[in-house]
Amino acid sequence: MSLLILVVADEPDVEVLFRQRFRRDLRAGRFTMEFAQSGPDALQRISCATDVPLILILSDINMPGMSGLELLPRAKALRPDVPVIMITTYEGAETKRKALENGAQALLTKPIDFVTLRNEIDLCVERAA
């Protein structure tokens, strides 16, 4: 069974970076990653993620159109069972409060600490097993 992680970010280099950082996991089939470049695209993918178990959503906060903070409650309404980790350049107290109040599991700052992110992913994979 292949597990799905959805990464939501408007910057195209995010996909290249994540595929590089998690290449062994992806090659081994431990999980797959899909990439959405906007909030509406992410919501469509979340709604359609029925073929494989969606185990984690990683979302940037600062995106044009629908921000990650606007996406978060809508994603949780569609899939309350799926943890969401928010990613931001600026970790202000207000941003963190809003993210956690709306159901985010965690808030990571850029540049991303991939050791911390890997630990979060490992927990999600273990829970899904």
Q: At which residue positions do the language-model features occur?
A:
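Two-component/phosphorelay signaling modules centered on CheY-like receiver
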Residues: 12-34
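Receiver (REC) domain active-site loop signature in two-component systems and cognate sites
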Residues: 63
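Acidic, metal-coordinating helix/loop segments flanking the phosphotransfer/catalytic sites
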Residues: 19, 35-56, 77
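Alpha4 helix (beta4-alpha4-beta5 surface) of REC/receiver domains from two-component response regulators
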Residues: 15, 70, 91-106, 119
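Short amphipathic alpha-helix used as the core "switch/output" element in two-component signaling
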Residues: 44-47, 69-81, 101
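Active-site T/S-Asp motif of two-component receiver
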Residues: 58-60
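A Lys-centered signature of the CheY-like receiver
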Residues: 110
